Amino acid sequence: MCYNMEKYTEKKQRNQVFQKFIKRHIGENQMDLVEDCNTFLSFVADKTLEKQKLYKANSCKNRFCPVCAWRKARKDALGLSLMMQYIKQQEKKEFIFLTLTTPNVMSDELENEIKRYNNSFRKLIKRKKVGSVIKGYVRKLEITYNKKRDDYNPHFHVLIAVNKSYFTDKRYYISQQEWLDLWRDVTGISEITQVQVQKIRQNNNKELYEMAKYSGKDSDYLINKSKSL
């Protein structure tokens, strides 16, 4: 997995902004780690120096650090890709990518909304039709911030393993409208207008990165100091 120095520079610059946000929330020793985060990078390379791989770095490992979160997302995406390849080859399964969302909420409602999301998802997978098609899943919570409205949108990205026959067997296939109806039912929110569901195509890394990236985008939580963290 080659290292993207351009992306690293962008994330390191965001780390400078992050330091101002996090300072009042952590101790002096942890703050030193955040300030020095990824100032030392050691690489291994091939003979031509065209391919380089990060070997060692001084990471702060703070879950909100833009650099550390980006590196973890890349690592998780690779892990997901390897897992999917194994399950496809050994277990003969396919995958669908499901995104579940609800209307935005204000900051003081966010904690309760996340709890409600988790409860609703548990109800969803216990539904007979859903439970019969899911052979395994990976779920990630992502929270985005709308600067204009000053509100938040928590939503789930779910990678679901299904039998190959799922897409052709009408007894088990769940259409987008059915997913929407099920999600509306378990949340009790009829105002939900859409869910997104699609089959994962081979070698498509976009969905994997959506799954792997951190639950809050640094572009969102570094906007408003009074609302963040």
UniProtKB/Swiss-Prot annotation:
The keyword Lipid metabolism does not apply. Keywords: DNA replication, Plasmid. The keyword Repressor does not apply. One of its GO terms (biological process) is DNA replication. Pfam families: Rep_1. DNA binds at residue 214. One of its GO terms (molecular function) is DNA binding. It comes from the Bacteria. InterPro entries: Rep (IPR000989). Produces a single-strand nick in a specific site of the plasmid, and this nick results in single-strand replication by rolling circle mechanism. Belongs to the Gram-positive plasmids replication protein type 1 family. PC194 is a plasmid that specifies inducible chloramphenicol resistance. This is Protein rep. It comes from Staphylococcus aureus. The lineage of its organism: Bacteria, Bacillati, Bacillota, Bacilli, Bacillales.
